[in-house]
């Protein structure tokens, strides 16, 4: 039986109606500050928490509920005689329902130029303490941190007069997750203040479920999608406009495609399968970029993931509607484009903003995490070195830079053949580099003649250059750094190939 409830919330969504419902059920309400004002201004009877404690709010509101008459009322074990005697001796009222959510710390630190002092003042102390007390004593007390529960709680109280034990346990679990995520946000903010960088002494993060997925990489694997609490970027901020629910593999491929297409400032299109590009292209129009990307490997494009870095127009949509695609993602779609694409009921249309730079990548391993900064180093042609007798032409330079931006997104060992506007062949994930080169060159076919080749890491031997020469490759870009670089340079010189060393490796595992 719930007789007394304590309400103290920062997010006042639904709190007035909830308080009204509690009062109608005969529950006595105690409240604090702005919550009390909102309730009483609505004509609902509620008592200030001072009527419990005998102490006023003090120190600019820092001390309101940190009092034995509050926490004794929450933490007392109801069927423990000693606890009951202590309550009677000290005039402590039992508190059966605690409704609390916390100061808006994440929202505060998200403001531009927020001061440390302002951030500190938005660290809640009394709130988490009440939440944890009530969650600990969930056998007797209900703890509510999410306004979404208000209606169902009122319904349960009307029907049963109390909250079922199993339901209180679920609320307690949610409450501990709520305070844990809150503390993670504070610790990470302080890490930033201390300039601890992307790899601090403790790596903390909190996530909330977006949705269950049909299955994982394979049908026998269970899966769900979670987003980082308090952030609004990347896959966690995607907006699905149309189509079936996303799968695990869709989201993995979408991440790869989205990072790839934003390598370019010109209109660009990338088509992805298993995180590797079937085709990628730039052009003066989005339509032409997509057509070129599709024609790079029209067989593999079937059932692919398409990423575009411009608003999708009707002409591009019409072209994409001609084949089966799993996902199309872009920063926006025109109404005309949506009308065309939504005629295909299963295709997933995703709207998403440009990726933020300076993020970290995290990989779960048994018993730990691997954390690294993203492979988004800013590169400049001026820092590259031409190591062959033949210099690249300006057209070849453009092709080399195009290929170099893409090859880092291909699974190692990675070889990519292109001209200055589109991919021609991609060799991914082979255990030796010359094997990847053979795949890419075979895919490029006759188009390899006069094209360029990019390699994500150095050539351990001269055989890759020799293979490229047989197919007519005109220029090569690679990191260099092998103890046998001279073999590759000699092979390039003998074939009249221009070769550029970047001194930067781009492995992708």
Q: Where does each model-flagged region fall?
A:
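Short beta-strand segments
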Residues: 8, 75, 98-103, 144-145, ...
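Glycine-rich phosphate/pyrophosphate-binding loops
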Residues: 137, 141-149, 267-278, 419, ...
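Feature captures the catalytic cores and cofactor-binding loops of soluble hydro-lyases/lyases
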Residues: 13-18, 22-69, 73-77, 82-93, ...
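Short, glycine-rich nucleotide/cofactor-binding loops
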Residues: 5-13, 247-249
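Long, structured protein-protein interaction/assembly regions in large complexes
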Residues: 197-413, 420-423, 433-437, 442-447
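Internal alpha/beta core interface subdomains
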Residues: 3, 16, 92-227, 238, ...
């Amino acid at each position: 039986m719930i007789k007394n409830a304590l309400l103290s919330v920062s997010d006042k969504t639904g709190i007035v109606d909830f308080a009204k419902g509690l009062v109608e059920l005969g529950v006595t309400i105690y409240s604090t500050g702005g919550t009390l004002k909102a309730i009483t201004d609505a004509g609902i009877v509620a008592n200030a928490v001072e009527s419990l404690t005998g102490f006023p709010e003090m120190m600019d509101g820092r001390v309101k509920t940190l009092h034995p008459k509050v926490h004794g009322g929450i933490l007392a074990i109801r069927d423990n005689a000693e606890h009951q005697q202590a309550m009677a001796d000290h005039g402590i009222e039992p508190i059966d329902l605690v409704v609390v959510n916390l100061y808006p710390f994440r929202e505060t630190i998200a403001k531009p130029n927020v001061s440390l002092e302002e951030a500190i003042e938005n660290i809640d102390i009394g709130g988490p303490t009440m939440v944890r007390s009530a969650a600990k004593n969930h056998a007797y007390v209900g703890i509510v941190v999410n306004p979404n529960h208000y209606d169902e709680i009122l319904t349960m109280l009307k029907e049963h007069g109390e909250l079922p034990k199993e339901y209180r346990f679920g609320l307690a679990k949610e409450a501990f997750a709520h305070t844990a995520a809150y503390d993670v946000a504070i610790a990470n903010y302080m890490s930033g203040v201390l300039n601890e960088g992307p790899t601090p002494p403790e790596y903390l993060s909190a996530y909330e479920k977006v949705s269950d997925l049909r299955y994982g990489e394979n049908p026998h694997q269970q899966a769900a999608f979670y987003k980082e609490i308090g952030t609004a970027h990347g896959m966690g901020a995607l907006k699905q406009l149309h189509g079936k629910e996303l799968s695990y593999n869709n989201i993995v491929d979408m991440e790869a495609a989205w990072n790839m297409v934003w390598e370019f400032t010109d209109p660009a299109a990338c088509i992805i399968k298993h995180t590797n590009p079937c085709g990628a292209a730039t052009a003066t129009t989005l339509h032409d970029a997509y057509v070129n990307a599709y024609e790079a490997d029209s067989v593999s494009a079937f059932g692919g993931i398409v990423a575009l870095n411009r608003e999708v127009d009707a002409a591009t949509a019409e072209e994409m509607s001609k084949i089966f695609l799993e996902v199309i993602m872009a920063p926006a779609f025109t109404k005309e484009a949506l009308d065309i694409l939504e005629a295909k009921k299963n295709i997933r249309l995703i709207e998403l903003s440009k990726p933020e730079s300076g993020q970290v990548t995290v990989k779960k391993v048994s018993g730990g995490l691997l954390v690294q900064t993203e492979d988004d180093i800013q590169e400049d042609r001026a820092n590259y070195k031409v190591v062959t007798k033949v210099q690249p032409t300006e057209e070849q330079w453009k092709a080399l830079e195009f290929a170099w931006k893409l090859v880092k997104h291909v699974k190692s060992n990675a070889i990519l053949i292109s001209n200055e506007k589109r991919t021609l062949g991609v060799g991914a994930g082979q255990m030796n580099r010359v094997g990847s080169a053979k795949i890419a060159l075979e895919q490029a076919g006759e188009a390899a003649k006069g094209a360029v080749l990019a390699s994500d890491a150095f050539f351990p031997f001269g055989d890759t250059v020799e293979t490229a020469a047989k197919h007519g490759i005109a220029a090569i870009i690679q990191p260099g750094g092998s103890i046998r670089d001279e073999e590759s340079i000699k092979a390039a010189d003998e074939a009249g190939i221009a070769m550029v060393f970047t001194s930067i490796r781009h492995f992708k595992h």
